[in-house]
């Protein structure tokens, strides 16, 4: 912090509100200071012990650790905030408990999914200025930030988080809105699917707390097969793919072909009973909606981002699928940076610390004058 006359601005905050995880921290840092689940938990049972300081709601990791006695709710579904009261609790927790700052002193950069309803943006703006008294704020599209983080200005981003996946072609820093495609198939659907196929195997996972166990199994043991049919044969004929997992109560379960059947749903949504195209076809369709002159650059810059792209083997599989879809002479490159789980946040951190960005913030005075609709004018 420099305390010069012209530089009394506080460090901007960057808050990436995902459907599954909140990533929050300070602009200029290379990783988010706070990462916790976007969960609000409310007790399912009557409190009997007085004076324990039981709360009526728990947020994030605390909700996660007490999940056995709570009903867990995610206020963000498919990238869209569905419960604003809970969302406010999450932001409050972020500012006061995790980052320990006063939101009325620091400008705040928020992120949102592309093709989100306009009302969603306005409500975010309103809460920031009216509830938290932000001095300034900005709303940015997640995928654009991911590209910033990878150091490119042109490319197509496949951003797949917990609630929503989308493909966003960006050329020379401009998102091409007509070619953005959205797929409501992401980490949460994969977790639900894994719950279902584990149940077929005879293990029962039903409650919201058990879903978190399955999510952990998915993250620790899941992977993407290069050739699904071949992998299924291998799994059927040998035990080389089997792994064991210890449940919280000490019971050990074995998981075999479920390890790659789960992530396969990204490429074959029909597994989930969805009629949409897989992620590889969605990327291809998105590229084909762009002008013919920019396609070559997009094929050569396929950037993966978001937690659901963390499955081992996804880059190779993506390469293979894209090669079979694209024209035969086309050079195809899949970029999967190791920090892609947080690349959206990192991009926000880069953007908010640029000196040229200072003019972009929506200031409180502007909000007071124009109301929530200002967000559509100022934030592209």
UniProtKB/Swiss-Prot annotation:
InterPro entries: Actin, Actin/actin-like_CS, Actin_CS, ATPase_NBD. SMART domains: ACTIN. The keyword Protein biosynthesis does not apply. Its EC number is 3.6.4.-. It is found in: Cytoplasm, Cytoskeleton. PANTHER family: ACTIN. This is Actin, muscle. It comes from Branchiostoma lanceolatum.
């Amino acid at each position: 912090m420099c305390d010069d006359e012209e530089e009394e601005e506080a460090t901007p905050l960057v808050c990436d509100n995902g459907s599954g995880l909140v990533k929050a921290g300070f602009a200029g840092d290379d990783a988010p200071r706070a990462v916790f689940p976007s969960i609000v938990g409310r007790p399912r049972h009557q409190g009997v012990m007085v004076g324990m300081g039981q709360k009526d709601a728990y947020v994030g990791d605390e909700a996660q650790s007490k999940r056995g006695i709570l009903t867990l709710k995610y206020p963000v579904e498919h990238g869209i905030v569905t419960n604003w009261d809970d969302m406010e609790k999450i932001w409050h927790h972020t500012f006061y408990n995790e980052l320990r700052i006063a939101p009325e002193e620091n400008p705040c950069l928020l992120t949102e999914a592309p093709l989100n309803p306009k009302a969603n943006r306005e409500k975010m703006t309103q809460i920031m200025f009216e509830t938290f008294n932000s001095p300034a704020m900005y709303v940015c599209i997640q995928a654009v930030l991911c590209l910033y983080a990878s150091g490119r200005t042109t490319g197509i981003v496949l951003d797949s988080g917990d609630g929503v996946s989308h493909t966003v072609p960006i050329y020379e820093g401009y998102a091409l809105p007509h070619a953005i495609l959205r797929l409501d198939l992401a980490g949460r659907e994969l977790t639900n699917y894994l719950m279902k196929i584990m149940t077929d195997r005879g293990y029962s996972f039903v409650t919201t707390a058990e879903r978190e166990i399955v999510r952990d199994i998915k993250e620790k043991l899941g992977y993407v097969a290069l050739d699904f049919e071949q992998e299924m044969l291998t799994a059927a004929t040998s035990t080389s793919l089997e792994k064991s997992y210890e449940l919280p109560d000490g019971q050990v379960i074995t998981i075999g072909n479920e390890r790659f059947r789960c992530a396969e749903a990204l490429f074959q949504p029909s597994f989930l009973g969805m009629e949409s195209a897989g992620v590889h076809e969605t990327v291809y369709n998105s590229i084909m909606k762009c002008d013919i002159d920019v396609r070559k650059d997009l094929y050569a810059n396929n950037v993966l981002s978001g937690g659901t792209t963390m499955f081992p083997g996804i880059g190779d599989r993506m390469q293979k699928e894209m090669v079979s879809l694209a024209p035969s002479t086309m050079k195809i490159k899949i970029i999967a940076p190791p920090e892609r789980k947080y690349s959206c946040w990192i991009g926000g951190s880069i953007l908010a610390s640029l000196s040229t960005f200072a003019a972009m913030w929506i200031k409180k005075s502007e909000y007071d004058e124009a109301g929530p609709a200002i967000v559509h004018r100022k934030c592209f």
